[in-house]
Amino acid sequence: MGNCCGTAGSLIQDKQKKGFKLPNPFSNEYGNHHDGLKLIVLKEPTGHEIKQKYKLGRELGRGEFGVTYLCTEIETGEIFACKSILKKKLKTSIDIEDVKREVEIMRQMPEHPNIVTLKETYEDDKAVHLVMELCEGGELFDRIVARGHYTERAAASVIKTIIEVVQMCHKHGVMHRDLKPENFLFANKKETASLKAIDFGLSVFFKPGERFNEIVGSPYYMAPEVLRRSYGQEIDIWSAGVILYILLCGVPPFWAETEHGVAKAILKSVIDFKRDPWPKVSDNAKDLIKKMLHPDPRRRLTAQQVLDHPWIQNGKNASNVSLGETVRARLKQFSVMNKLKKRALRVIAEHLSVEETSCIKERFQVMDTSNRGKITITELGIGLQKLGIVVPQDDIQILMDAGDVDKDGYLDVNEFVAISVHIRKLGNDEHLKKAFTFFDKNKSGYIEIEELRDALADDVDTTSEEVVEAIILDVDTNKDGKISYDEFATMMKTGTDWRKASRQYSRDLFKCLSLKLMQDGSLQSNGDTK
């Protein structure tokens, strides 16, 4: 991101084309200060000592790369949010480029009432600190559920705001790539509070007609052309269309028990308008959804066309009749379960540590029988067998194809690390067990109500027993009032794969999935992309 004269991701892609190996600055070999060098992430931070100007307060949230704190400007007493990204969590050069690009995009975006404002940036030896506008009004779905009475009119207002954000992004050459309800917060708790886009971590700069092939985003909201690995800014309209569908009925339009199933449903693009409440939803609303979720991006509506659509234009006159308790209940369940999964994913991500990569590198040395610093597909297969990991030959080829970034027919140590977590997951669910242990504080073998309430203290309003009980009710299939490991594992693996514990591993996972879908004929690759 720092220097954005080229296209998004061009630095990484150009070097990969030339066979240039980007180092992992926090691998065991490199370390935080290798040969006296420090990792510098930002090109021009505001400063280096954030605590000279701001006082960091309570924790507001925690993500894959760091922690968000309440932040007070010492001189004025003004309150902000500070997103502190820990350098030790940036395990690959791609992670570092993501942070650079996120900051550059937020700096270049003009002020907009529905986009969170970046105030200042700081960088010290341990972290990058982003001081941003504070949004205290909660997540989109939580607000909807709390209101109780939910209508088409309310959905039209929300989607209009989201599309205006998309339009602003596209106008300034930014593709968001990760539009989902969790990435929108209300500015405050007032009824009239603005809805704001808060996360640009996967966004990229683009030029008209430019195509991308990196698989990013969240499964439910992913456009078919992302899986085909040839896409442009049209994917943001698709994601917004998925959000609109969920707003009107409470469940995603493309759903299955596994990520592979979700991907196939997306590629088929069959939209269900038969189940409740669709019979009472207006034809205009359904027409807009169909046009936003058109499988051909060339025929999908643009942001301006969405805003010009009759359902949006007449949004203030849209039906104000409640869509029913069923929709509200579904939205609540969808929101609550996302929170539990998200909390578990954070635990898993914390275990994908430098210590784990050290173990993986030891395995690489065992496989590298020729001692040339890279392994062939044969060595990979034999090595996996020796480690007791049974992987079908077809899957080994898929892993090899996905991991071999420079396409030289070998895996070097960094490429091996990038795919190894998926290899390990094929053999066991050790990270999922670690997540379960995190919740099961008293080692009873079950997650009990008190343990669940404590674990989700930062994520839900624990004054409401209703929320915690809703999770227990949904996950506890044998109705004994607590969650067993098997029930937890089933919940985590339903609908979206729990293994997306980190952004990079998610990219690798979907790359493998895309290759597999190509092999079984579910999709065809569309032309050359960047």
UniProtKB/Swiss-Prot annotation:
Q: Which residues form the signal peptide?
A: none
Q: Which residues are involved in binding Ca(2+) 2?
A: D404, D406, D408, Y410, E415
Q: Where is the active site?
A: D178
Q: Which residues form the Protein kinase domain?
A: 54-312
One GO cellular component term:
cytoplasm
Q: Which Pfam families match?
A: EF-hand_7 (PF13499), Pkinase (PF00069)
Q: Where are lipid groups covalently attached, annotated N-myristoyl glycine?
A: G2
Q: Which UniProt keywords apply?
A: ATP-binding, Calcium, Kinase, Lipoprotein, Membrane, Metal-binding, Myristate, Nucleotide-binding, Phosphoprotein, Repeat, Serine/threonine-protein kinase, Transferase
Q: Does the keyword rRNA-binding apply?
A: no
Q: Where do the segments described as Autoinhibitory domain lie?
A: 318-348
Catalytically driven reaction(s): L-seryl-[protein] + ATP = O-phospho-L-seryl-[protein] + ADP + H(+); L-threonyl-[protein] + ATP = O-phospho-L-threonyl-[protein] + ADP + H(+)
The residues covered by the EF-hand domain are: 355-390, 391-426, 427-462, 463-498
Instruction: Indicate which residues the UniProt annotation says bind Ca(2+) 3.
Output: D440, N442, S444, Y446, E451
- UniProt-annotated location(s): Membrane
In short, the EC number is 2.7.11.1
Binding annotation for Ca(2+) 1: D368, S370, K374, E379
Which residues are reported to carry the modification Phosphoserine? S218, S484
Record carries keyword Transferase: yes
Q: What is its main location?
A: membrane
Q: What does this protein do?
A: May play a role in signal transduction pathways that involve calcium as a second messenger.
Query: By what name is this protein known?
Result: Calcium-dependent protein kinase 14
State the organism named in the record: Arabidopsis thaliana
